[in-house]
Amino acid sequence: MKSVTLKELSLLLDGVVQGDETLVINSVATLEHATAGQISFLANSKYRAQLESTQASAVLLSAKDAQDYSGTALVVKDPYVGFARVAQLLDTTPKAAIGIHPSAQIDPSALLGEGVAIGANAVIGANVILGENVQIGAGTVIGQDCIIGSNTRLWANVTLYHNVHLGQDCIIHSGAIIGSDGFGYANERGQWIKIPQTGGVRIGDRVEIGASSTIDRGALGHTEIHNGVIIDNQVQVAHNDIIGENTAIAGSTTLAGSVTIGKHCIIGGNCAIAGHLTIADGVHLSGATNVTGNMREPGLYSSATVAMENKVWRKNTVRFRQLDELFQRVKTLEKNSNTPE
């Protein structure tokens, strides 16, 4: 088990210890469930009531919250960021054993860096390049001409089609499929003609892609996911989409083809973005927002209808259907009221 003293954590986080700096911390936990040897945090005022009753050995607090706290604390600028850093330091996620499992199938032309780990029944195709310390989980398939940067991890049962490039320090979770064909067809007299998807996928450094998400290859040119992007579970990224640096996309969101999303955007869960649109840097979409036009200015955008009692929703649905009629009636009334007698 990993462990660290509060003094060492204060140096890591540029914080100040309030209490015993020799206290040893071995893991992180919530205020409600923490026990001795664990450190917790307060980043949301909704949980302030749990602060006095917590059994945590220490708590990450802002300077303001630390003033009224009698227990041991590590005072930092941002308790949530501090929690993330400590959680990384004490992370106990198991790492794959270095080496190649006997059941793995590796093409002779593949180039493997030092320290790679390849699990049972994994398949590595022709001309694949794996950087140093790459971890390939059991049952994962890497198609030909793929490149995977150093320290990237693919968990079990990930599929990379051909011509997919992953940067360094990426994490791809189980069930993710990268490089499948985009939804490209032409219609000739009622019949669909498949358009070969001849591009690839280019993914930058420090990208994380959640379980069962799908990233389509480009039709012509590449689908691009830039450095620092985080994508949640069950997200669909279509052909030729471009996602800017450090953008976050929450679960069940769907992007149609040829969408360009800027840097530092936050896309809430269950959003839908129509094709061939551009979204500016710094846009934040709240959950279940439907985007049908370009967004050229940063800011928070929403379109979802919030939950309400069914009887109220049914009445409002009827009223919504009557909006055009009501508008025309108001327009007529305004016109008549402005007509001289």
Curated annotation (Swiss-Prot):
The active site is at H239. Transmembrane segments: none annotated. It comes from the Bacteria. CDD domains: LbH_LpxD. Keywords: Acyltransferase, Lipid A biosynthesis, Lipid biosynthesis, Lipid metabolism, Repeat, Transferase. It is an enzyme of class 2 (transferase). InterPro entries: Hexapep, LpxD, Trimer_LpxA-like_sf, UDP_GlcNAc_AcTrfase_non-rep. It catalyses: a UDP-3-O-[(3R)-3-hydroxyacyl]-alpha-D-glucosamine + a (3R)-hydroxyacyl-[ACP] = a UDP-2-N,3-O-bis[(3R)-3-hydroxyacyl]-alpha-D-glucosamine + holo-[ACP] + H(+). One of its GO terms (biological process) is lipid A biosynthetic process. Belongs to the transferase hexapeptide repeat family. LpxD subfamily. Homotrimer. PANTHER family: UDP-3-O-ACYLGLUCOSAMINE N-ACYLTRANSFERASE (PTHR43378), UDP-3-O-ACYLGLUCOSAMINE N-ACYLTRANSFERASE 1, MITOCHONDRIAL-RELATED (PTHR43378:SF2). This is UDP-3-O-acylglucosamine N-acyltransferase. It comes from Shewanella sp. (strain MR-7). The gene is lpxD.
